[in-house]
Amino acid sequence: MIRKAFVMQVNADAHEEYQRRHNPIWPELEAVLKSHGAHHYAIYLDVERNLLFATVEIESEARWNAVASTDICQRWWKHMRDVMPANPDNSPVSAELKEVFWLA
């Protein structure tokens, strides 16, 4: 498995709405993530800085990247763009993090 971590932001006035929309996520989105090899996907909120920290284990970069081109992912991004900064294609503004330590 490949471990990934990344950060995103959520609008200061949208913490509760962001959490509500993820509780639960759309079943179709969950199915696409799983079918594309995503496991142990978690998102954490830093309330004071409006930061979202996400971790996920993936089976391959190619399969993970393919999620973005699915219709359900495109609809999810559009659904979420009003609660977080988004790129012109509606994907969330994010930055990948470099792993510096792992204790198995």
Curated annotation (Swiss-Prot):
One of its GO terms (cellular component) is cytoplasm. Keywords: Carbohydrate metabolism, Cytoplasm, Isomerase, Rhamnose metabolism. It catalyses: alpha-L-rhamnose = beta-L-rhamnose. InterPro entries: Dimeric_a/b-barrel, L-rhamnose_mutarotase, Rham/fucose_mutarotase. It comes from the Bacteria. Pfam families: rhaM. One of its GO terms (molecular function) is L-rhamnose mutarotase activity. One of its GO terms (biological process) is rhamnose catabolic process. It is found in: Cytoplasm. The active site is at H22 (proton donor). Its EC number is 5.1.3.32. Substrate binds at Y18, Y41, W76, W77. Pathway: Carbohydrate metabolism; L-rhamnose metabolism. Belongs to the rhamnose mutarotase family. Involved in the anomeric conversion of L-rhamnose. Homodimer. This is L-rhamnose mutarotase.
